[in-house]
């Protein structure tokens, strides 16, 4: 069992008796809590710095900074629950924190999954609009639209997390006196639970990733048509977002695979204890890999974002925002020529210069 456990009440005897040792390995109970604790410390520090830098220095004036701010907040809300999961795993999957915290900590996982993937999708669409359709997109690529989009993302992610709020609860195995935090459901709800698990695979990963992949493919094609020197001016934020997306993919794909295997177990397609053990052992490991996404994002911002590095150094040197130099995201002098060329190449060049002046927030 793990923090992704499911318990079908009509099937407890099979789980508790026939496959009672699945996933119960000493190295899991030692290594996983250490990893969770490390992610907690690094994630809280890193994402807190991102929130402070963007809010205090960058003032959330651009579309990208608003999305990145919400991404950091999502990661921060999630990583603060990791000490609970670390203790839960260290105690051999025994949950002593009560039903309320079981629901809250579980909901934070699902909420983080959906908000992260939706925000990354919006970032890729924003980059696509800014680079491929720079003139037309200026109408809707505003801070207000970005804020409303983020509100919508949080609402949709919260609705997608409702099964955790409703079905996640503590369950006592009387024969072992073990209290677990798991999704508990009647056999009549099996197809609903399977549907929710598949939604994580399809809505929470596959569809958004296809949108992201398409967006960046079209962006790459467009960038080939402009001058290399001009492209370099837009590389900072482009490289950073691509890195964030790739990190998300490689961190979450193992978890998505094991979630699908868990669906097959729930549907009785897989019916042997060896596979139960593989899934129950692999699930906390893949969850750890997925959780690394929440603590590594801030370091990507610092590595790829020149302005972010500058503001971060100002922060750790205790330089107040009002005293900082004013070479900020909106103060670069425009290089746009006074007249537009009739050719497509010149039009794109000018548009990208304008975009860089407005959007170079990193």
From Swiss-Prot:
What's noted about post-translational modification? C-terminal Ser or Thr residues may be phosphorylated.
List, alphabetically, the Pfam families matched: 7tm_1
Q: Which keywords does the record carry? A: Cell membrane, Disulfide bond, G-protein coupled receptor, Glycoprotein, Lipoprotein, Membrane, Palmitate, Phosphoprotein, Receptor, Transducer, Transmembrane, Transmembrane helix
Cellular localization per UniProt: Cell membrane
What tissues express this gene product?
A: Expressed in lung, liver, kidney, and spleen, with highest expression in the heart.
Q: Which Gene3D superfamilies match?
A: Rhodopsin 7-helix transmembrane proteins
Disulfide bonding pattern of the chain: 19-273, 102-181
Topology relative to the membrane, per the entry? Multi-pass membrane protein
Single GO MF descriptor: C-C chemokine binding
Q: Where are the transmembrane segments?
A: 27-56, 63-90, 100-126, 143-166, 192-217, 239-267, 278-303
Q: Which GO terms describe its biological process?
A: calcium-mediated signaling; immune response; neutrophil chemotaxis; phospholipase C-activating angiotensin-activated signaling pathway; positive regulation of cytosolic calcium ion concentration; regulation of vasoconstriction
Record's GO cellular component terms: external side of plasma membrane; plasma membrane
This chain is glycosylated at: 3, 18, 177
InterPro entries to which the protein is assigned, alphabetical = ATII_AT1_rcpt, ATII_rcpt, CCR1-9-like, GPCR_Rhodpsn, GPCR_Rhodpsn_7TM
Q: What is its main location?
A: membrane
Q: What does this protein do?
A: Receptor for angiotensin II, a vasoconstricting peptide, which acts as a key regulator of blood pressure and sodium retention by the kidney. The activated receptor in turn couples to G-alpha proteins G(q) (GNAQ, GNA11, GNA14 or GNA15) and thus activates phospholipase C and increases the cytosolic Ca(2+) concentrations, which in turn triggers cellular responses such as stimulation of protein kinase C.
Name the record gives this protein: Type-1 angiotensin II receptor A
Q: Which organism is it from?
A: Xenopus laevis (African clawed frog)
């Amino acid at each position: 069992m793990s923090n992704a456990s499911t318990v079908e009440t009509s099937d407890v005897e099979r789980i508790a008796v026939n496959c009672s040792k699945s996933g119960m390995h000493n190295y899991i109970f030692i290594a996983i809590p250490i990893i969770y604790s490390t992610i907690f410390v690094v994630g809280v520090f890193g994402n807190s710095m991102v929130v402070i830098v963007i809010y205090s220095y960058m003032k959330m004036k651009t579309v990208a900074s608003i999305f990145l701010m919400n991404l950091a907040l999502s990661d921060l809300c999630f990583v603060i629950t990791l000490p609970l999961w670390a203790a839960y795993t260290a105690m051999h999957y025994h949950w002593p924190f009560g039903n309320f915290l079981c629901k809250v900590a579980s909901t934070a996982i699902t909420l983080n999954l959906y908000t992260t993937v939706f925000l990354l999708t919006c970032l890729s669409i924003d980059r696509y609009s800014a680079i491929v359709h720079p003139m037309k997109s200026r109408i809707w690529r505003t801070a207000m639209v970005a804020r409303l989009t983020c509100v919508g993302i949080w609402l949709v992610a919260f609705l997608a997390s409702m099964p955790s709020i409703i079905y996640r609860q503590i369950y006592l195995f009387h024969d072992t006196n073990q209290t677990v935090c798991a999704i508990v459901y009647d056999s009549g709800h099996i197809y609903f639970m399977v549907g929710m698990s598949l939604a994580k695979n399809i809505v929470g990963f596959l569809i958004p990733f296809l949108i992201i992949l398409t967006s960046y493919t079209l962006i790459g094609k467009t960038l080939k048509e402009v001058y290399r020197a001009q492209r370099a001016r837009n590389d900072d934020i482009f490289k950073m977002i691509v890195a964030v997306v790739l990190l998300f993919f490689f961190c979450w794909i193992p978890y998505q695979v094991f979630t699908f295997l868990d669906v097959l177990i729930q549907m009785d397609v897989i019916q042997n204890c060896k596979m139960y053990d593989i899934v129950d052992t692999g699930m906390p490991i893949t969850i750890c890999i997925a959780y690394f996404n929440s603590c590594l994002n801030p370091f990507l911002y610092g590595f790829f974002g020149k302005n972010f590095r500058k503001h971060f150094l100002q922060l750790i040197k205790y330089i107040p925002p009002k005293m900082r130099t004013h070479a900020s995201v909106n103060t670069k002098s425009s290089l746009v020529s006074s007249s537009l060329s009739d050719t497509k190449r010149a039009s794109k060049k000018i548009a990208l210069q304008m975009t860089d002046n407005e959007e170079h927030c990193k």
